[in-house]
Regions:
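Reductase modules of NAD(P)H-dependent flavoproteins
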Residues: 2-3, 141, 148-216
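Short helix-loop-beta connector
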Residues: 104-109, 212-213
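Ferredoxin-reductase
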Residues: 2-85
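Histidine-anchored nucleotide/phosphate-binding helix
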Residues: 121-133
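Ser/Thr-glycine-rich phosphate-binding loops at phosphate-binding pockets of nucleotides
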Residues: 115-120
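A structural signal for isolated positions on well-ordered beta-strands in alpha/beta enzyme cores
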Residues: 65, 90, 111, 139-141, ...
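Short, Lys/Arg- and Gly-enriched loop/turn segments at beta-strand edges
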Residues: 46-53, 96-104
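Generic structural signal for buried aliphatic residues
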Residues: 38, 89-92
Length: 216
């Protein structure tokens, strides 16, 4: 386990029967770019059982956060969903990934398209000051089946718009677009269908995507 660190769980939040988030301590030596993922897991029978998880917390925070689905027969998630405050979580020493700002060409609009727990890397990027310096508009689209699957909705609708640091940037530049497929909601439909029909762009008041202005 030389490539792993042991962190301590400080908070567990169950959004509903299918989704949960974990916060842990963060080793002072851990460095990562917002949007990267780490291998995390548990020691099972003396051996590490690991899976890749995007780091949901921004890189300036003193803790780590991960967002997960509950899979009852999943080798790791069947165990991870029962984790408690004070338990240990294994975290790889060197996060990696390509869903980072360094890999994007300059543009006007940044589209962050996600479904389910694919939201995780964008939770970090949405709180990255450099994102707001580089783009005129940041559009986060989060597609789920039911409204109660919209984890972190309150953060986007209430907390960040009123944040002392990000509030002004967020209100001016950020567009949060949640959409639901299985029940009535203000935005309904699959992300891909909303883009193909043009409804997404009509709703947010921006022109359809083009290669000169838009980055995904």
């Amino acid at each position: 386990m030389s490539k792993l660190r042991t962190e301590t769980v400080t908070e567990v939040h169950h959004w509903n029967d299918a989704l949960f988030s974990i916060k842990t301590t963060r080793d002072d030596g851990l460095r990562f770019r917002n949007g990267e993922f780490a291998m995390i897991g548990l020691a099972v029978d003396g051996r590490p059982l690991l899976r890749a998880y995007s780091i949901a917390s921004p890189n300036y925070e003193d803790h780590l956060e991960f967002f997960s689905i509950k899979v009852q027969d999943g080798p790791l998630t069947s165990r991870l969903q029962h984790i408690k405050v004070g338990d240990e979580l294994l975290v790889s020493k060197k996060p990696t990934g390509t869903l980072v700002l360094d890999d994007l060409l300059p543009g006007k609009h940044l589209y962050m398209l996600s479904t389910g727990t694919g939201l995780a890397p964008f939770l970090a990027l949405a709180r990255d000051p450099e994102v707001y310096e580089r783009f005129d508009k940041i559009i986060l689209v989060h597609g789920v089946r039911y409204a109660d699957d919209l984890a972190y909705r309150d953060m986007f609708e209430n907390e960040l718009p009123n944040d002392e640091i990000f509030g002004e940037w967020f209100r001016e530049k950020f567009i949060y677009y949640p959409t639901v497929t299985r029940e009535e909601f203000r935005n309904q439909g699959r992300v891909t269908d909303l883009m193909k029909s043009g409804k997404l762009f009509e709703d947010i008041g921006l022109p359809p995507m083009n290669k000169d202005d838009d980055r995904v």
